[in-house]
Amino acid sequence: MLDLTTYRALFADHELRRIVLASVAPRLPIGMNALGLTLLVQSQSGSFAHAGLVSAAYMGALAVQAPVIGRVVDQNGPRGVMLPLGMLHALALLLLTLAVTQRAPLAVVLVSAFAAGIVFPPISMTIRAMYRKSDMNDALKQSAFAVEAAIMEGCFIIGPLLVSLTMLAASPAFAVLAAALLASVGTWHFARSGALVRWGRVEYVAQRHWLGPLQSFGVRRALLLSLCLSMGIGLNEITLPAFANASGYPARVGWFYAAMSVPSAIMGVAYGSWRLRWPLNRQIMLSGLWLAGGSLLMAASTQTWAFMLGCALTGLAFGPMMTALSLQLGKLAPSEYSTEAFTWSTTLFMIGLGVGFWAGGMMIERHGIATTLVACSALMTIAALCCLLVPEVRGTAQPEGA
């Protein structure tokens, strides 16, 4: 089931190992803030709707800045933006925490959340573009993207657990402050790891199209698919803190995230070693249908153990789906727009998560957790069927005679 040969070949590169390890800490705030901001605002305002709105503002800002930063990086390289954005993001998180704890008006909190998201450092997009531009063969690239997906899942495992620990010890505010520290120190370490050099040279073209990668029909459809799937993920994930809160043990939310993320990371790594014949859009379709079924199982759960089991079974599809989405976009995007293409992916994914969190928060307060998960299942089913509209590409080259 799991062939480690390509992973051994991948990490025989000592510099790449250092870069990958250095990329973890500055990305932990993604996993921490998605939950930490929700719990921090909810603890101060008593409203999941307000909490979902603030999280949506933060994620929306991540979405807005991503293509702009991506185009800057494609045209000038990542050196000039990485460290300044890391420091500004840490400062913005400090100001956001102050605004929430001092019970500032909702408008001020929303502006603060947007400001924090608008200056997030481009760690993930730099890593993915580095893989896309490298001279690695298709098998190594699939494993590299699988590692990338597993790291992101790891951030969503460790991040919520750190938030849960701070809730046991003190307040969700401490989780956001810890995220600020990780953003500043982690970005500095990542910038010194060799990643900015390894990213390569800027690929100059005679005339860059103003739409960048969006001029490609296949890229546009792949990105819209990512948007739909991320909306479903947002609807699903907002139910985790809501279920924990309804059970009377809010700190359990970290265990729900872990129950979902650990199987996701394991399956993501396993998927990276597989050489499947199916086109990537059909692999993504299968993952979407699995997530739809898992959401229905979670909706039917009333006991904590059953909900955790539903989270675990649902999570099995997340890792493979995220890896396949990255591979699909990497195959469809023109090489000179590789960083910008991945930033558009980040943009629409964050918009979808934000919309899902916002809509889910409203639905939970008005209709309950189960209804929200049923809506998630319906959306995932529609998104899965839309996979067939994306041009077919394969993750790895098939051997002759296959």
Residue ranges and their predicted role:
Residues 112-154:
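Cytoplasmic helix-loop-helix junction between adjacent transmembrane helices
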Residues 87-103, 290-302:
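C-terminal ends and interior cores of transmembrane alpha-helices
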Residues 37, 121-135, 240, 320-333:
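Intracellular juxtamembrane helix-capping segments at the cytosolic ends
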Residues 2-63, 213-258:
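Helix-loop boundary and gating motifs at the non-cytosolic
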Residues 64-78, 167, 267-280, 364:
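Helix-to-loop junctions at the C-terminal end of transmembrane segments
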Residues 48-49, 138-148, 250-251, 335-345:
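Loop-to-transmembrane helix entry/capping segments in MFS-fold secondary transporters
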Residues 336-367, 376:
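A late C-terminal transmembrane helix in Major Facilitator Superfamily
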Residues 281-325:
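C-terminal transmembrane helical hairpin of 12-TM major facilitator-type secondary transporters
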